[in-house]
Amino acid sequence: MTVLINQTGACTTVPLALSTTTPTTLYTATQFDAVLGLRVTNTHSSAVVVTVELVRSATSYAIIDQSVAANTSIEGPDYLPMKEGDVLKVTLGSANPVDVVAVIMQGAGRNG
């Protein structure tokens, strides 16, 4: 699959420090945005299950659903296009501290 993006979109880094089992919004798309990178780091001494979901029109799609070992990181998709109103949510299986960082291209647009 070939994806062409509008290079005029602004990139931003979206950090989230999390230590609760409540689903937490990481990012809400305001237009045709794109996730260019996603990293989850477990800063605790015990493993934790991390779920990252794309929510579109009240339907959730798992992007990451994985146990992250103590003091390690995992990476998500290299490119994830989003529509206006799409939401990225993060949920932890236990209340251990986790850092999540996403790199977003705002207004990436689409072509094709």
Locate the predicted segments by residue.
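C-terminal interaction-tip segments
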Residues: M1-D33, G37, L92-G112
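Short solvent-exposed strand-capping/beta-turn motif centered on an Asx-Ser/Thr pair
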Residues: V40-S45, G93
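Short, surface-exposed beta-strand/strand-loop-strand elements in extracellular ectodomains
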Residues: S45-Q66
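A short, sequence-level motif marking secondary-structure junctions
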Residues: S67-N71, Q106-G107
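Beta-sandwich interaction modules
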Residues: N71-G85
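Cysteine-clustered segments with highest specificity for TGF-beta superfamily mature ligands
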Residues: D86-L92
